[in-house]
């Protein structure tokens, strides 16, 4: 292990370590309770109705956003960075995507559909996905404003100003909403 600050932790007896660990555990539990409160507050944030009928490009051609849910009540969108003029996807996004095949199965059993969306053309996404050995659902938003409307892609003008930054069906028929 390399330490960048050049300091070394104190070496102690097992009893000293145990006492320090117990004190630290008290702080960890406080943090857990605080994190639980913050998570509850995040879940209680209001939703924003999705006003546009976004249509994405995928394996079957054009698909409306509401159909991306595949009959489930929630949709998790991973905004995979892959611009139209790139030859391959973002390396960091690719790292995370290596786990999407199994995560998708887990989420499906919990009434959640997980997909990736990128601005690159669908054919380019599909070729990269095949090369990487992935089978998760991936759609192109290259023919709509989705990425721009939800602040994950930016025009040069927006980049010069304030840049900001989730979707679910609720018991209101086919209306969609954006969440945290």
Residue ranges and their predicted role:
Residues 55-85:
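A short beta-strand-turn-helix
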Residues 17-34, 38:
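Amphipathic alpha-helical coiled-coil segments
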Residues 131, 135-180:
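Thiol/selenol-based redox catalytic cores and closely related redox-interacting motifs
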Residues 14, 21, 28, 51-53, ...:
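A common structural microfeature
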Residues 40-59:
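Coiled-coil termination/hinge junctions
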Residues 73-125:
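Short, thiol/selenol-centered motifs that function as redox-active sites or metal-ligating centers
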Residues 59, 117, 139-141:
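Conserved beta-strand termini and adjacent loop/short-helix elements that scaffold enzyme active sites
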Residues 1-24:
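Short, charged, low-complexity amphipathic alpha-helix
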């Amino acid at each position: 292990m390399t330490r960048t600050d050049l300091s070394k932790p104190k070496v102690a007896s097992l009893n000293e370590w145990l006492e320090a660990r117990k004190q630290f555990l008290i702080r960890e539990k406080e943090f857990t309770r605080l994190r639980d409160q913050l998570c509850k507050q995040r879940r209680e944030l209001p939703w924003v109705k999705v006003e546009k009928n976004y249509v994405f490009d995928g394996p079957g051609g054009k698909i409306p956003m509401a159909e991306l849910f595949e009959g489930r009540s929630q949709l998790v969108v991973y905004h995979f960075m892959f611009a139209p003029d790139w030859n391959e996807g973002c390396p960091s996004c690719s790292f995370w995507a290596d786990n999407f095949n199994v995560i998708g199965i887990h989420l499906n059993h919990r009434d959640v559909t997980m997909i990736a969306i990128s601005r690159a053309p669908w054919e380019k996404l599909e070729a990269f996905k095949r090369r990487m050995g992935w089978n998760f659902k991936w759609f192109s938003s290259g023919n709509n404003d989705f990425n721009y409307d939800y602040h994950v892609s930016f025009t040069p003008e927006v980049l010069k100003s304030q840049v900001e930054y989730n979707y679910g069906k609720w018991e209101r028929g086919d209306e969609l909403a954006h969440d945290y």
